[in-house]
Amino acid sequence: MRIVVVGATGNVGTAVVRRLAAARADGGDTSVEVVGVARRLPDLRADPYGSAVWHTVDVGAHDAVDRLTAVFQGSDAVVHLAWALQPTHDIPVQYRTNVTGTANVLAAVARAEVPQVVVASSVGAYRGVDVDGKRTAVDESWPTDGIPTATYSIHKAANEAAMDAFEADHPSVTVTRLRPGLIFQRDAAAEIRGLFLGHLVPMSIVRWIRWLVLPLPYPFVFQAVHADDVADAYWRAVDRRAAGAFNIAASPVLNPPRLARAFGMLGAVRIPLRLLRGIVTVTWRLRLQPTDAGWIDIAAGVPIMRTDRARSVLGWEARHTSEEALRALVAGFADGANVPGSGPLRG
């Protein structure tokens, strides 16, 4: 089985390559061939990167379809994970990777006649809900038209529509979509700090806030999952050639008190959503930090997902709780952890 992982050096991509290497080792199945595609090569001396054959392709480039087609030839599945969260002040640059890049991957899958494509969607693709709406978990049939004030959500929703069209035009290709909650792991600490807090904020900040309370709006209720558990879901989707959409999230649902505990803080105090959104907007416009207010809208507006289908069809279960996944990330902040073979890109 030849599996190509596009975007194989990021938070999730590294975990997927690691899981595929483990599947080959645990099962003694040396026929599993892992091919990594990234914008730049990782350090092949670091695990798990040495377990894959590598190609460098910019998925948003004008020649991406031709280059990806050549890489995809003879593959049994393509797992598409490439994504750009930065620069948040330049949406066309993000669009080039996120939406144009996905269109290029799908076109190359069709041209190379790959039998399955697995695409990283997200809880962020779903239509938003209010506070009361978070009381009822939704399944994979919930509309995927996104949250209109969040660039990330807009791009994920656009890709869902692109996959709908691709699926209709190419019925012989198995199209699989994973829609995970927020994805955490220890080694992603430097990447996540750079993407959401900025490099002006030291990673050791978690050591300074333990005697503080966490100010958050009440609607900040969302799900998370460990990167290794998401990677396991990707492997199971490929191994079983499972079609359709799958919600991926661990228990329990995270809320302000649980978030405060994970950060080792004294507790949480409720503040108005409008206040936090305003602070984030001003500091983002002043370029003091890289997170735009759309991420506040995502945290406050995404629905809570049911994961029954992943359990029944994929046989998937989270091995880590959402709190364990977040605590691992927090520990990574304190230790300055980073993916060893692929440093975080700066926006």
What annotation goes with each model-predicted range?
Residues 167-221:
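NAD(P)-dependent short-chain dehydrogenase/reductase
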